[in-house]
């Protein structure tokens, strides 16, 4: 929230139980290749408030944990993704439902015209979407569609099911930013 009170720049915020760091790092590399002024911040290890030389066109890629989102009241991200949700940090949140609610603050704080990316066919995420007042446009991300994109890619690291899911989100967000898919392939 302190960050948001200083900067009103476009943010791409990634949360979920697994895959946040990988997804953020790939997105960051893709945007750098496309010559965007981009900063990678948040839970990934780069403190948000230590960022320097921020311009109007600077885009922030934010890795957000449930701990960071739990107390958020005003932070808004133009692009927001919830990769997946499985029981985690229950010692902090007390229940899985509280953990889900912390993660969903990211989408609930979005405005009309913002974009939310969620995993297709995820029953937990779908249930929460239906019971929440979400104003942003929702894009369902299907990892099964990434296989065509990954054809002829030799990097076995990205051929695991987990990384296919991560790349599916990167591809979906990249398309909304009008980034050429061949640049994404070069990064991979």
Where are the regions a protein language model picked out?
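Short, basic phosphate-binding NTP loop
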Residues: 1-13, 24-27, 34
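Buried hydrophobic packing segments
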Residues: 3, 27, 31, 48-52, ...
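Conserved hydrophobic helix-helix packing surfaces used for dimerization/oligomerization
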Residues: 11-12, 38, 59
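Active-site glycine-centered loops adjacent to acidic/histidine catalytic or metal-binding residues
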Residues: 16-17, 43
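Short beta-strand-centered segment that lines the nucleotide-binding/catalytic pocket of NTP-utilizing
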Residues: 36-48
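Flexible active-site lid/hinge loop adjacent to a nucleotide/diphosphate
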Residues: 55-140, 145-158
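A conserved, hydrophobic alpha-helical segment in the catalytic core
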Residues: 75-87, 158-188
């Amino acid at each position: 929230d302190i960050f948001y009170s200083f900067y009103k720049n476009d943010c791409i915020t990634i949360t979920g139980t697994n895959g946040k760091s990988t997804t953020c790092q790939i997105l960051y590399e893709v945007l750098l290749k496309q010559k965007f002024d981009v900063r990678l911040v948040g839970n990934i290890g780069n403190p948000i408030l230590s960022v320097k030389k921020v311009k109007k066109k600077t885009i922030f890629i934010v890795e957000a944990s449930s701990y960071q989102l739990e107390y958020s009241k005003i932070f808004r991200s133009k692009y927001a993704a919830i990769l997946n949700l499985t029981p985690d940090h229950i010692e902090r949140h007390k229940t899985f439902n509280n953990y889900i609610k912390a993660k969903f603050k990211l989408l609930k704080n979005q405005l009309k015209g913002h974009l939310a990316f969620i995993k297709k066919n995820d029953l937990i995420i779908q249930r929460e979407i239906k019971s929440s007042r979400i104003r942003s446009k929702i894009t369902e991300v299907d990892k099964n569609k990434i296989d065509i994109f990954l054809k002829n890619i030799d990097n076995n690291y990205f051929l695991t099911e987990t990384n296919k899911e991560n790349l599916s989100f990167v591809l979906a967000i990249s398309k909304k930013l009008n980034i050429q898919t061949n640049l994404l392939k070069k990064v991979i």
